[in-house]
Amino acid sequence: MHIMEGYLPMEWAIVWYIISAIVVGYGILNLNKVLKNNPEAKPLLAISGAFMFVLSSLKLPSVSGSCSHPTGNGLGAILFGPAITSVLATIVLLFQALVLAHGGISTLGANIFSMGIMGPFVGYLVFKALRGKLNITWVVMLTAIFADWATYLTTSIQLALAFPVPDFMSSFTEFGTIFAITQIPLAIAEGLITALLWDYLSELRPELFEKITNIKKGGNNE
């Protein structure tokens, strides 16, 4: 999903930078409020960011100018919402671009928009829609799966907008189909891993999980 350095036309790189900057700025404000009201949430923030970093660093070759990997953005979306998750993703993506040559600076805005904004936003919507209807473990798994798929759907749209050859729909279908080969199984695996981590953390700090998410231990997240 990480679009590599210099791959996008400059006009599109600027567009994604502007949109992402607005959301990340809002996320920083929310993050400050969370840390002020719940300073004990810092370990969960760190775990959410580290989880995203580790999973999104496991890249596989994919379409030209990009790659495939898990995203790890579902956990943060559940715990802190999509705005704060965009801040975590910005830190992760910037570090990967500077240190691992994974992604790029010119394409950072586009990568933040897909992995840090749209993926978590869709995941959060799935979480809200299923909350109270299914067991929390299933809800977490499905949230992570759809957050991953939404990330790659967004990247497919971004690449198709930048390179609409012969037209947008044909380009989108081509990019999306190639991504689907790896992302369908990867997202399912990511969902399972995220659910296992959720169960472990909720057992470890049930009182903190209940305070942050209003989900009672052992309940159906009602």
UniProtKB/Swiss-Prot annotation:
One of its GO terms (cellular component) is ATP-binding cassette (ABC) transporter complex. It is a multi-pass membrane protein. InterPro entries: CbiM (IPR018024), CbiM/NikMN (IPR002751). Keywords: Cell membrane, Cobalamin biosynthesis, Cobalt, Cobalt transport, Ion transport, Membrane, Transmembrane, Transmembrane helix, Transport. Signal peptide: none annotated. It comes from the Archaea. One of its GO terms (biological process) is cobalamin biosynthetic process. GO terms for molecular function: cobalt ion transmembrane transporter activity. Pathway: Cofactor biosynthesis; adenosylcobalamin biosynthesis. The chain crosses the membrane at residues 8-28, 43-63, 75-95, 107-127, 134-154, 178-198. Pfam families: CbiM. Gene3D superfamilies: 1.10.1760.20. It is found in: Cell membrane. NCBIfam families: cbiM (TIGR00123), PRK08319.1 (NF006184). Forms an energy-coupling factor (ECF) transporter complex composed of an ATP-binding protein (A component, CbiO), a transmembrane protein (T component, CbiQ) and 2 possible substrate-capture proteins (S components, CbiM and CbiN) of unknown stoichimetry. Part of the energy-coupling factor (ECF) transporter complex CbiMNOQ involved in cobalt import. Belongs to the CbiM family. This is Putative cobalt transport protein CbiM. The lineage of its organism: Archaea, Methanobacteriati, Methanobacteriota, Methanomada group, Methanococci. The gene is cbiM.
